[in-house]
């Protein structure tokens, strides 16, 4: 029974892995990806509410002035 010659397996496996790595890198680098989303500037409108022009103070039940 002849013995299997495994002396070339190492270089074959390494060269196959290097070739696959290069092919995948070329395939990935040729694809175009969408740009990352940029934040949208929102202009807030100032509304005139009647309670904004007045100053009101809310008293809690325990903080009422003494009578």
Swiss-Prot record:
Cellular compartments per GO CC: mitochondrial membrane; proton-transporting ATP synthase complex
Disulfide bonds: none
Intracellular or extracellular location(s): Mitochondrion membrane
Transmembrane found in the keyword field: yes
Keywords from the UniProt entry: Acetylation, ATP synthesis, CF(0), Hydrogen ion transport, Ion transport, Membrane, Mitochondrion, Transmembrane, Transmembrane helix, Transport
Residue positions where N6-acetyllysine is found in the record: 54, 57
TM helices/strands, residue ranges: 8-24
Gene Ontology MF terms: proton transmembrane transporter activity
Membrane-topology descriptor: Single-pass membrane protein
Gene Ontology BP term (one): response to hyperoxia
Chief location of this protein within or outside the cell: mitochondrion
Purpose of the protein: Subunit 8, of the mitochondrial membrane ATP synthase complex (F(1)F(0) ATP synthase or Complex V) that produces ATP from ADP in the presence of a proton gradient across the membrane which is generated by electron transport complexes of the respiratory chain. ATP synthase complex consist of a soluble F(1) head domain - the catalytic core - and a membrane F(1) domain - the membrane proton channel. These two domains are linked by a central stalk rotating inside the F(1) region and a stationary peripheral stalk.
Record text on subunit structure and interactions: Component of the ATP synthase complex composed at least of ATP5F1A/subunit alpha, ATP5F1B/subunit beta, ATP5MC1/subunit c (homooctomer), MT-ATP6/subunit a, MT-ATP8/subunit 8, ATP5ME/subunit e, ATP5MF/subunit f, ATP5MG/subunit g, ATP5MK/subunit k, ATP5MJ/subunit j, ATP5F1C/subunit gamma, ATP5F1D/subunit delta, ATP5F1E/subunit epsilon, ATP5PF/subunit F6, ATP5PB/subunit b, ATP5PD/subunit d, ATP5PO/subunit OSCP.
PANTHER family: ATP SYNTHASE PROTEIN 8
Family named by the database record: Belongs to the ATPase protein 8 family.
Protein name, per record: ATP synthase F(0) complex subunit 8
Species in which this protein is naturally found: Rattus norvegicus (Rat)
Organism taxonomic ancestry: Eukaryota, Metazoa, Chordata, Craniata, Vertebrata
